């Protein structure tokens, strides 16, 4: 596996989310570059929101940790935001 780039991180978030939800066709990831931090906005079906967040937010926290770790390799900051 090569060095991750923003397209791979977007695809990674999309893959993780689609693996968790009942409605994978409604998963969408938007990338919003900023000056210091790139935001990855994850949109899922309202009924799948709990599955992506997980008990006590553990699933969402794990996804954010993976994204931050990949960003560290690129010397960039990434933030995962889960929106309805």
Predicted regions and their residues:
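RNA-contacting regions in translation and RNA-metabolism proteins
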Residues: 1-51, 66-84
């Amino acid at each position: 596996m090569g060095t991750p780039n923003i397209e791979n991180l977007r695809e990674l978030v999309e893959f993780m989310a689609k693996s968790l939800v009942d409605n994978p066709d409604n998963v969408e990831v938007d990338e919003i570059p900023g000056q210091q931090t790139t935001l990855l906005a994850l949109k899922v079906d309202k009924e799948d929101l709990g599955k992506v967040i997980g008990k006590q937010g553990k699933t969402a926290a794990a996804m954010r940790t993976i994204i931050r770790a990949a960003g560290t390799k690129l010397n960039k900051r990434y933030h995962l935001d889960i929106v309805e």
